[in-house]
Amino acid sequence: MIRAIVTDIEGTTSDIRFVHNVLFPYARERLAGFVTAQQHAEPVKTILDNLRRETDAPAASTADLITTLFAFMDEDRKSTALKALQGIIWRDGYLNGDFTGHLYPDVLPALEQWKAQGIDLYVYSSGSVAAQKLLFGYSDEGDITHLFTGYFDTLVGAKREVQSYRNIAEHLGHAPGTILFLSDIHQELDAAEAAGLRTIQLVRGDRDPASHHPQVQRFDDIHPEQIPA
């Protein structure tokens, strides 16, 4: 019996184009000015200090760090410091109404149904927890954060590492086999499966021939009550 569902965001609940064509450019355009203006104020000061440790560059100037952040964006590096800064910048965008968090139309009804069945819902994304809460708090369907019991980001581990999913299962307090992980990336599902979790792959486009995981196109194709123990 599935007791908890952990879902990815990009390509799973939300169109990856929203992230890459809206969120990333919005943060990139504002990053240098924001960091320069806020470098001595919290939480930016601590984030920059963390970035110095992350890059083993304790003497790096703010200008050096900004250059590093742009390089990380070009590489799509899953840097915790970068994700934290992006999340702060995106917050202004959501609050100003510059955009709303994209949700596929099949997502909300399924989440509500699973919640009504007594299944705990969680999010696991490479974006910061703050950014996750913003996307679901200012989504196309309004604030749906009340549906989620908790959120995980790269602080729990990288998404393609088996230990990350062991950490999540331990935090949830459920047996791994009672946790269902949803993602569009089969390498993430491979890691989750190796940790004992159940898996389903969202394929919003063509099927993934390299994947052995069950594949569905929509959230309403997922029936957790039918997944055998």
Curated annotation (Swiss-Prot):
Compositional bias annotation for Basic and acidic residues: 218-229
GO molecular function, one term: 2,3-diketo-5-methylthiopentyl-1-phosphate enolase activity
Pfam families linked: Hydrolase
Enzyme class: hydrolase
Coiled coil regions in record: none
Enzyme Commission identifier(s): 3.1.3.77
Span list, region Disordered: 207-229
Catalytic activity: 5-methylsulfanyl-2,3-dioxopentyl phosphate + H2O = 1,2-dihydroxy-5-(methylsulfanyl)pent-1-en-3-one + phosphate
Co-factor(s): Mg(2+)
Stored InterPro entries: Enolase-ppase_E1, HAD-like_sf, HAD-SF_hydro_IA, HAD_sf
Subunit structure: Monomer.
Classification via HAMAP family: Salvage_MtnC
Family designation: Belongs to the HAD-like hydrolase superfamily. MasA/MtnC family.
Protein name: Enolase-phosphatase E1
Species of provenance: Klebsiella pneumoniae subsp. pneumoniae (strain ATCC 700721 / MGH 78578)
